[in-house]
């Protein structure tokens, strides 16, 4: 059986769901923008037309070519043998999507395409096919992308989302395919595996969600409901195969014991829903009745699923907005009081209504109902559902949204983020750096540092001066959260916050909480675990990026001693270059983290040393010599594990002398610290060859903070 390339289009946001749907049909596909592509036979393509609840169009890919002018476009379309696809006595229609660098006018592209096809038929048959934009036999689609033109032949003439059952609809109709998508995303397919599946739509409108749920429950192929469905009239079409597949689909229908219940307060829309349910032939499983959502009661003994698409706020309610918000407040009450154990999914573009419910969302997914951007909010109704104990994330979101309304100072912060990102982009592209500092208190009133870790942001608030009103400082902090979310398109849950201040004693090594949220990042050829929530720092110091590279380069196939090694990131880089490493740190937690970093990079930890010890005490007793030493002590430490308090300005001379005692005569010591007022000991400068390498170690993303660290290269004098 010959294979072809097909594209199944869908609404933006449901591509992965469509891919899963095709997987269930035994068709392997790859996700693309607004659809999926798959290799297969016409039998596979027909199955998608018949069974897909989500696809809009199934298209045969005919050809793709780069074209740069109108003649090239004409020649490309002419090079396709259209007589292989349809007869001259069939009518066709051309549709254009996408954008092309050289063609601004899609009508021009359509006309050129039509001319090329018609001219070919005239040359070959002395006749021309008709153009029919209302009732074509075939649809030729051109998708434009950059300088490329992709040519498709559509298998279905009408969009697959049309099921024919919706004879009557309300003011804001929900597309059938989107209704199916939110049901799948909400977990209806899993619910159907239960002995007694239950679905309630408490604001059912004209019944689209209820009907789509019933089609899935009864295994009714959507195309069977489409009385006006029309396939392409192509020479490639296999009518016998199509009819055989339709018969198989009809026989696959089954009864169900699912309970599918709809409610609405409006008798007029309930009447429409009743007629639509009858048209769809699912009146045996779907029940509807009039009820105010604030009076919703659980009359069932087992848990189920609630899915609804309420009216979109001001668009339908206008001056009744206050009533709408009151409705949702009451809905939240009913859910938390009477639907324990249930799952709830609400599709809306009006987030104010969701806030009024006072329930914690477990998931949020963006969908499009035509051109309207909407969000599917999901909830688990349990003891944690109500806003009784507000999480830090929920608090951040609430205060961030509220702070944005109090003043417009944060606009400057937003503009600075945009400017910094624009300035850094060429460097980021050239260097391959994925984790970087975007902002570092560039605007005095927004005293925060913004570090980017892929899709996550680590936001550090510098402790406000005592003269600054703490309420104002806190408001600006939440405004910063708001603008990071809006400007950088970072999800609130991926914005991790910390207040920067001196930590004392064991605070330096203790967790903030016990979530154990580790993520993997890349730094050049190495991978590291980072944790944004559980510790005071993430597990990697971004400002040390360059000195880690220097240390690794110097340590190639040599021995490295990493003092105050933290999570052993410098050791990993060195080990990847063949170094044998010894990492010393007081914290067993960080050393274990370091071992995990080694294993993440497929490095054998048995070939490297990890020593939990006070570095000063260990250096005093050490007799081994190393080729390279990396000494990166904290500015201040008074941990009980240390014999004494460490003050880097006071103690660096002792530390360097001890480290040099463990260095080979031809070796090199890299010394770094973050004390801004640090002054190197004159005795050390006189005793050794000391070169300040601050500029060498300063990355592009830290140029605005040139005093962030002090870096020295120290060697024995020859």
Swiss-Prot record:
GO CC terms: cytoplasm
Keyword Oxidoreductase: no
InterPro entries per the UniProt record, alphabetical: 23SrRNA_methyltr_KL, DNA_methylase_N6_adenine_CS, RlmKL-like_Mtase, RlmKL-like_Mtase_CS, RlmL_1st, SAM-dep_methyl-trfase, SAM-dependent_MTases_sf, THUMP_dom
Localization per record: Cytoplasm
Catalysis: reaction(s): guanosine(2445) in 23S rRNA + S-adenosyl-L-methionine = N(2)-methylguanosine(2445) in 23S rRNA + S-adenosyl-L-homocysteine + H(+); guanosine(2069) in 23S rRNA + S-adenosyl-L-methionine = N(2)-methylguanosine(2069) in 23S rRNA + S-adenosyl-L-homocysteine + H(+)
The entry's keywords: Cytoplasm, Methyltransferase, RNA-binding, rRNA processing, S-adenosyl-L-methionine, Transferase
Top-level taxon in the UniProt lineage: Bacteria
GO molecular function: 23S rRNA (guanine(2445)-N(2))-methyltransferase activity; RNA binding; rRNA (guanine-N7-)-methyltransferase activity
EC number, as in UniProt: 2.1.1.173, 2.1.1.264
Coiled-coil blocks: none
Pfam families referenced in this protein's UniProt entry, alphabetically: Methyltrans_SAM (PF10672), RlmL_1st (PF22020), THUMP (PF02926), UPF0020 (PF01170)
Major site of localization recorded for this protein: cytoplasm
Domain THUMP positions: 44-155
Family indicated by similarity: Belongs to the methyltransferase superfamily. RlmKL family.
NCBIfam families per UniProt: PRK11783.1
Function according to Swiss-Prot or TrEMBL: Specifically methylates the guanine in position 2445 (m2G2445) and the guanine in position 2069 (m7G2069) of 23S rRNA.
Identification of the protein by name: Ribosomal RNA large subunit methyltransferase K/L
